[in-house]
Amino acid sequence: MIEIKISKIPRWDEINKIVKLREKDLVLLKLPKSVYEHPKMAYKLEYLKKKGIFIEVENAKRGRKRKVDDETVKKIHELIIEGYSVREIGNILGIGKSTVWDYAKDCIKELKLERFKKLVWEYREYLINKGKYSPSLQVLFLELEATVDYDLEKAKKILEDIIKHVKEF
């Protein structure tokens, strides 16, 4: 099998060379998504497929990841926990939102969960200070703490029960 990697839109003479290679052996043509989806490639891809050439789209990112120091990465995580959006964080730190997203996407779920827990604790403290924290609320908060890590839907229902209970109190 012959593998050919292309990173630009091929000319027709280049396509004919690929077709000639097909006469000798199977041909696998690898190209980036941007080239695959380009309007000029529609007829060329159709022609190649008719000639028995296999086409594979590579999803690899082009270029290098922008380097950000560890201190900035920590700041990105702190700002996410505080509730800032990716765009706002980019504006605050003076870096692009795609760079912020690159460094946040792997742990954003955990960071948002941490923010949620922080808000629950603040709400609990607020209720204690206002004198609305009762034993039944304490049980609901304990149940919320136990479920928040593994079942967010159940945690949401418990939180709704807490809010309903506070409004009735």
From Swiss-Prot:
A GO molecular-function annotation: DNA binding
Listed name of the protein: Uncharacterized protein MJ0769
Native source species: Methanocaldococcus jannaschii (strain ATCC 43067 / DSM 2661 / JAL-1 / JCM 10045 / NBRC 100440) (Methanococcus jannaschii)
InterPro entries: Homeodomain-like_sf, Resolvase_HTH_dom
Origin organism lineage: Archaea, Methanobacteriati, Methanobacteriota, Methanomada group, Methanococci
Gene3D superfamilies membership: Homeodomain-like (1.10.10.60)
One Pfam family of this chain: HTH_7
